[in-house]
């Protein structure tokens, strides 16, 4: 079989690039490992950092008819200026339509002739031309009621048209108010106050490599039944040679144990344990520098005020995942309450003792974990640096700082670990 016959007409890459994918995407577990390291291909983000999906629809059959068939959803989804323009045109069209009808009735009844030549009661009083008929239409639909123009019993058709215009006006008003209230009450804007960390990190947690990212709520109102989920999106070539440009793979964030449901009062670090079932099981730090994938993270819940479901989204490319880093603490106990410092929300500090190999190599005992004392030492340094900042602030207020017995005890217990004291941001 020739190369031309193997070419996929639906593939977005050339046949040479297909061959490259076959080499770099194969692995023992289907997700990586055993790769030939090449330079990273520049890929487009599928989900932007602000949650918008980077897609564009094209060649849709009967798009206008389908959108008009669901007019209410169309009005809710479009921008405010377009929605207000549509309703303004709807009002003008209805006023103009019934104005023309009343003018035609007046012409047919002879109401536009001079008063001395008529000799009978007009259908609509004080309507002597099209402009007067148009004003009468506006007064009828908006119930202004100036009192100069009114319909008489002379023409039943005119009475029927007044009733019809009143019904049409109520329908337009109801539709407009409903669409505006639905648009204003949408929980979409609630996602603007739900925050994701700029980067995700990979570090050890309880002796296992874990992928972590941080979420936060900028409002005091809660997100009811908040839960998170994540998906890994990457191109893949099947065993039959089919190229899938955006293959979606679920990432477990503790669904079976209920860990995906969170109480989002303070910022929380979401954790994905990189185990045998993880798509990141065979990826090491070196693989992370050359791999081509995107992790989409989703936070869902109900808005406390309206009980409507909202969804916040973000994503992390491979170069936005920091290997061997941890997030700086943002929650501190202060007097009789807890203080959340969002200036540290996106900040991380490096943990040099994090293994550079993949989780698969760790399971196969190809990497010797450092002693637990080293991790404890780094964690205590991080918190002691925070205590030092509190003591400096206390000294500025004129109160004597507390003695630094904790740090002396740490230096005495560290033994062979002769490291100089550094601030948290330098770890």
UniProtKB/Swiss-Prot annotation:
Residues 393-409 have a biased composition (Basic and acidic residues). It catalyses: K(+)(in) = K(+)(out). Residues 387-427 are annotated as: Disordered. K(+) 1 binds at residue 143. GO terms for cellular component: dendrite; membrane; monoatomic ion channel complex; neuronal cell body; plasma membrane; T-tubule. K(+) 4 binds at residues 145-146. A motif (Selectivity filter) lies at residues 143-148. Disulfide bonds join 123-155. Keywords: Cell membrane, Disulfide bond, Ion channel, Ion transport, Membrane, Metal-binding, Potassium, Potassium transport, S-nitrosylation, Transmembrane, Transmembrane helix, Transport, Voltage-gated channel. InterPro entries: Ig_E-set (IPR014756), IRK_C (IPR041647), K_chnl_inward-rec_Kir (IPR016449), K_chnl_inward-rec_Kir2.2 (IPR003272), K_chnl_inward-rec_Kir_cyto (IPR013518), K_chnl_inward-rec_Kir_N (IPR013673), Kir_TM (IPR040445). Residues 1-77, 184-427 are cytoplasmic. Homotetramer. Forms heteromer with KCNJ4. Can form heteromeric channels with Kir2.6/KCNJ18. Association, via its PDZ-recognition domain, with LIN7A, LIN7B, LIN7C, DLG1, CASK and APBA1 plays a key role in its localization and trafficking. Inward rectifying potassium channel that probably participates in controlling the resting membrane potential in electrically excitable cells. It probably participates in establishing action potential waveform and excitability of neuronal and muscle tissues. Inward rectifier potassium channels are characterized by a greater tendency to allow potassium to flow into the cell rather than out of it. Their voltage dependence is regulated by the concentration of extracellular potassium; as external potassium is raised, the voltage range of the channel opening shifts to more positive voltages. PANTHER family: ATP-SENSITIVE INWARD RECTIFIER POTASSIUM CHANNEL 12-RELATED (PTHR11767:SF14), INWARD RECTIFIER POTASSIUM CHANNEL (PTHR11767). This is ATP-sensitive inward rectifier potassium channel 12. It comes from Rattus norvegicus. The gene is Kcnj12.
């Amino acid at each position: 079989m020739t190369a031309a016959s193997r070419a996929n007409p639906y593939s977005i890459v050339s046949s040479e690039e297909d061959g490259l994918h076959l080499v770099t995407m194969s692995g023992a577990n289907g997700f990586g490992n055993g790769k030939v390291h090449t330079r990273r291909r520049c890929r487009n983000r599928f989900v932007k950092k602000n949650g918008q999906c980077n897609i564009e629809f094209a060649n849709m059959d009967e798009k206008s008819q389908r959108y008009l068939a669901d007019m209410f959803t169309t009005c809710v989804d479009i921008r405010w200026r377009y929605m207000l323009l549509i309703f303004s045109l709807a009002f003008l069209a209805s006023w103009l339509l019934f104005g023309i009808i009343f003018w035609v009735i007046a012409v047919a009844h002879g109401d536009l002739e001079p008063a001395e030549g008529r000799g009978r009661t007009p259908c609509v009083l004080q309507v002597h031309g099209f402009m007067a008929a148009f004003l009468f239409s506006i007064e009828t639909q908006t119930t202004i009621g100036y009192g100069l123009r009114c319909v008489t019993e002379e023409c039943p058709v005119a009475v029927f048209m007044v009733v019809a215009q009143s019904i049409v006006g109520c329908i337009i008003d109801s539709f407009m108010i409903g669409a505006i209230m639905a648009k204003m009450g949408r929980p979409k804007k609630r996602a603007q106050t739900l925050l994701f960390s700029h980067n995700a990190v990979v570090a050890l947690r309880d002796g296992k490599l874990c992928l972590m990212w941080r979420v936060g709520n900028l409002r005091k109102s809660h997100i009811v039944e908040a839960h998170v989920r994540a998906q890994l999106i990457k191109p893949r070539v099947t065993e039959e040679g089919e190229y899938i440009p955006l293959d979606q793979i679920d990432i477990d964030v503790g669904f079976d144990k209920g860990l995906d449901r969170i109480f989002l009062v303070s910022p929380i670090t979401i954790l994905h344990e990189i185990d045998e079932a993880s798509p990141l099981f065979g990826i090491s730090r070196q693989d992370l520098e050359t791999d081509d994938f995107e992790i989409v993270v989703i936070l869902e819940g109900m808005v406390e005020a309206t009980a409507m479901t909202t969804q916040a989204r973000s994503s992390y490319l491979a170069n936005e995942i920091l290997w061997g880093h941890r997030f700086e603490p943002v929650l501190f106990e202060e007097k009789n309450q807890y203080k959340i410092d969002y200036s540290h929300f996106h900040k991380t500090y490096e943990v040099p003792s994090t293994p550079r190999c993949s989780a698969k190599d760790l399971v196969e005992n190809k990497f010797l974990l450092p002693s637990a004392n080293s991790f404890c030492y780094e964690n205590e340094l991080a918190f002691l640096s925070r205590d030092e900042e509190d003591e400096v602030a206390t000294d500025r207020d004129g109160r004597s700082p507390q003695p630094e017995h904790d740090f002396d005890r740490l230096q005495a217990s560290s033994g062979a670990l002769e490291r100089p004291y550094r601030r948290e941001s330098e770890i």
